[in-house]
Curated annotation (Swiss-Prot):
The lineage of its organism: Archaea, Methanobacteriati, Methanobacteriota, Stenosarchaea group, Halobacteria. Binds 1 zinc ion per subunit. InterPro entries: Ribosomal_eL37/eL43, Ribosomal_eL43, Ribosomal_protein_eL43, Ribosomal_zn-bd. Belongs to the eukaryotic ribosomal protein eL43 family. Putative zinc-binding subfamily. This is Large ribosomal subunit protein eL43. It comes from the Archaea. Zn(2+) binds at C39, C42, C57, C60. Gene3D superfamilies: 2.20.25.30. The keyword RNA-binding applies. PANTHER family: 60S RIBOSOMAL PROTEIN L37A, LARGE RIBOSOMAL SUBUNIT PROTEIN EL43. The keyword ATP-binding does not apply. Its cofactor is Zn(2+). Binds to the 23S rRNA. The gene is rpl37ae. It comes from Haloarcula marismortui (strain ATCC 43049 / DSM 3752 / JCM 8966 / VKM B-1809) (Halobacterium marismortui).
Length: 92
């Protein structure tokens, strides 16, 4: 008798279609998307995705734009860091 394999995750809905690498990428993206994200306004881990690039905190109802699958993109982090560095140089 066949033994039951492990859980397939969110990409298990595709079955054997689309290839292993594509299904794995979808599973990674969806797991990151559904993690707890901190609100940039209040700091609570209650941010939910409303649509493509639209995120909303369910605690303070702060709505903001971000990446399609993450509230903050790597490029956005870089820009924020460079703005902070420029502001700290002006203060000195």
């Amino acid at each position: 008798m066949a033994s039951k394999s492990g859980k397939t995750g969110s990409s298990g809905r595709f079955g054997a279609r689309y290839g292993r690498v594509s299904r794995r990428r979808v599973a990674e993206i969806e797991s990151e998307m559904n993690e707890d994200h901190a609100c940039p306004n209040c700091g609570e881990d209650r941010v939910d995705r409303q649509g493509t690039g639209i995120w909303q905190c369910s605690y303070c109802d702060y709505k903001f734009t971000g990446g399609s699958y993450k509230p903050e993109t790597p490029g956005g982090k870089t820009v924020r860091r460079s703005i902070r560095a420029a502001l700290s140089e002006d203060e000195e």
